[in-house]
Amino acid sequence: GVGVGTVYRHFPNRHALVEALSAERLRELVDEAQAAASADDPLTGLRRLLGFALDRMLDDPDFAAVLESAGDTGAQTSDLKAELDRAVTGLLNGVRLTGAVRSSVEADDVRRLLCGVAHAVRSGSGEVKDLYLDVLLQGLRPPR
């Protein structure tokens, strides 16, 4: 096995270890965001991306913690989050053209709101996941 001392020589704290373990999932999320941004229907792409991200956050609370964290310990995590934000920005721009997202909503807002939805789903019953995702999407719409 690997001793605690060996782990802490490579990772200064638990969050750094969790970031390293979450890198592959974060890469998958970036890839999904890029695919959603190039979808024929941007709104469908956004819904698919949010569902994909929410499922992974619910499956892996450590991954959710990495997405929720404002401070990254590793450059790889910061780079992947920046890449994710760029892809989500492109996706939001496409959805804005359909009139389905407020002009003031940014990629970081979507990530923070999704983290809130994940927390709410974990706190309640899993049966509310689709309802909360629908509420999030409706809340992103411009006021009427």
Segments predicted by a language model, with ranges:
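Solvent-exposed, amphipathic alpha-helical segments
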Residues: 28, 32-36, 113-120
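Hydrophobic alpha-helical connector segments
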Residues: 20, 31-59, 73-76, 85
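Helical hydrophobic small-molecule/effector-binding pocket
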Residues: 39-68, 92-94, 98-103, 124-126
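C-terminal peripheral helix-coil segments that are non-catalytic and often amphipathic
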Residues: 82, 86-101, 116, 123-144
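Amphipathic alpha-helical interaction segments
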Residues: 44-52, 109-113, 131, 135
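Short hydrophobic/aromatic patch on the recognition helix
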Residues: 2-11
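Short amphipathic alpha-helical segment with a characteristic S/N-K-E followed by hydrophobic residues
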Residues: 13-18
